[in-house]
A protein has these predicted regions:
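Low-complexity, compositionally biased segments
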Residues: 9, 39-40, 72
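N-terminal first-folded block
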Residues: 1-27
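Glycine-rich, flexible loop/turn motifs
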Residues: 3, 42, 75
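A short, structured beta-strand/loop element
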Residues: 23-59
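Short, flexible active-site loop motifs that bind/organize anionic cofactors or intermediates
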Residues: 2, 47, 65
Length: 81
């Protein structure tokens, strides 16, 4: 699947909230998200850029997929991307 080229950082954070991520703080132009489930914890920083660069988006999605034991395609489907 191709990654969207017009996705904003705030929109990505909103879609990640469907997976249980919560915004815990905002510092400057970055959002800090945390996911807690079953004793596991994952922290993630997302820039609020308009739009996110493809390499940045790919790196964020790769990190989430590894933390959640999902493939990239499964993650994209869950996020409706």
């Amino acid at each position: 699947m191709k990654l969207p080229r017009d996705l904003h950082g705030e929109e990505l954070a909103k879609r990640l909230s469907r997976l249980g991520y919560q915004v815990v703080r905002q510092t400057g132009s970055h959002l800090r998200l945390t996911w807690n489930e079953g004793g596991q914890e994952h922290h993630l920083t997302i820039p609020r850029h308009h739009p996110l660069k493809l390499g940045t988006l790919a790196g964020i999605l790769r990190e989430i997929a590894e933390a959640r034991n999902l493939t990239r395609e499964e993650l994209l489907k869950l996020l409706d991307l």
